[in-house]
Amino acid sequence: LSANKISLNQASVDQLQQLQGVGLKKAQAIVAYRQKQGPFKSIDELQQVRGIGPAIFAKNKTRLGL
């Protein structure tokens, strides 16, 4: 991962909040999803997290990694 990418599988709640449109609740939802479902298999899977829709995904797509 390059320095400006955020790893969906390793990022902390604080790191996830750096994404556009992602506040505390959404960041916590991403971490909870990861704990329940296991590691993200693709960045597209982020859209399965409650509160993360296509618009938020599109804004952050280039900053996401696994």
Please annotate each region the language model reported.
Residues 19, 37, 49:
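Acidic-histidine catalytic/liganding microenvironments
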Residues 64-66:
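Short, solvent-exposed mixed-charge patches
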Residues 1-6, 11-12:
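N-terminal, intrinsically disordered low-complexity tails/presequences enriched in Lys/Ser/Pro
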Residues 42:
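Short, charged, surface-exposed loops that flank catalytic or proteolytic processing sites
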Residues 31-34:
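Residue-level signature of tetratricopeptide-repeat
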